[in-house]
């Protein structure tokens, strides 16, 4: 599988994913190609070369909801297992994302004990958590069993002192 920008001519074989960021909204198209065929992407136009090329979009499996009842129960147990829980990319010792690292540093600065959950280890957890919190991005911070926010909200609350107040309330309850 190859992922290339459509800004320059690209040769892709087997399975191709073509992304375009022309409108600042990435669009992806996935095609199955015969191994002897090729897909050339140039100036936002697709040209196909190969003998007897049959192009068809691949089928995507989309469930109605990634948040199964079992996963919802697991998430409820996780967010209530500690006073502060951070769902993040990576771990507190090795964050795999700048936003996750920012929230970890804020919590460490406040000397807040927290549980970290690496969402990169489980795709079902990652997708289900987006539905559970109704929040599309990570990290996701939970305080006292309630969703608090992502990186931007946490950073702003840290600057205003609101984060420390919420953490103190949760620790005392």
Swiss-Prot record:
Result of changing residue 97 to A: Decreases protein stability
Amino acids binding glutathione: 89, 126, 130, 138, 151-152
Keyword Transport: no
Transit peptide, start-end: 1-63
Gene Ontology MF term list: 2 iron, 2 sulfur cluster binding; antiporter activity; metal ion binding
Upregulation: By sodium and magnesium chloride.
Sites bearing S-glutathionyl cysteine, chain numbering: 97
GO BP field: monoatomic cation transport
Cellular component, GO, one term: chloroplast envelope
Region entry Required for CAX1 activation, spans: 97-100, 133-137
Record-annotated Glutaredoxin domain positions: 72-173
Effect listed in the UniProt record for changing residue 97 to S: No effect on interactions with BOLA proteins, but strongly reduced interaction with SUFE1
Protein residues bound to [2Fe-2S] cluster: 97, 99
Free-text domain note: The C-terminal region (79-168) is involved in BOLA recognition in GRXS-BOLA apo-heterodimer.
Subunit structure: [2Fe-2S]-bridged holo-homodimer. Interacts with N-terminal part of CAX1 in yeast. Interacts in vitro with SUFE1, BOLA1, BOLA2 and BOLA4. Interacts in vivo only with SUFE1, BOLA1 and BOLA4. Interacts with SBP1.
Family: Belongs to the glutaredoxin family. CGFS subfamily.
Protein name listed in UniProt: Monothiol glutaredoxin-S14, chloroplastic
Organism per entry: Arabidopsis thaliana (Mouse-ear cress)
């Amino acid at each position: 599988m190859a992922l290339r920008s459509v800004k320059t001519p690209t040769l892709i074989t087997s399975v191709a994913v073509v992304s375009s960021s022309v409108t600042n909204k990435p669009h992806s198209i996935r095609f199955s190609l015969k191994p002897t065929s090729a897909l050339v992407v140039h100036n936002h136009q697709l040209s196909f070369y190969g003998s007897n090329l049959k192009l068809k979009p691949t089928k995507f499996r989309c469930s109605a909801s990634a948040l199964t009842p079992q996963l919802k129960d697991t998430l409820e147990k996780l967010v209530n297992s500690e006073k502060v829980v951070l769902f993040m990319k990576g771990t507190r010792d090795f964050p795999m994302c700048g936003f996750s690292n920012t929230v970890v540093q804020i919590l460490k600065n406040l000397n807040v004990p927290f549980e970290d959950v690496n969402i990169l280890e489980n795709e079902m957890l990652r997708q289900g958590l987006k539905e559970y919190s109704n929040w599309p991005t990570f990290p996701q911070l939970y305080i006292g069993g309630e969703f608090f926010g992502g990186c931007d909200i946490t950073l702003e609350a840290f600057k205003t002192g609101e984060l420390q107040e919420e953490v103190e309330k949760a620790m005392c309850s």
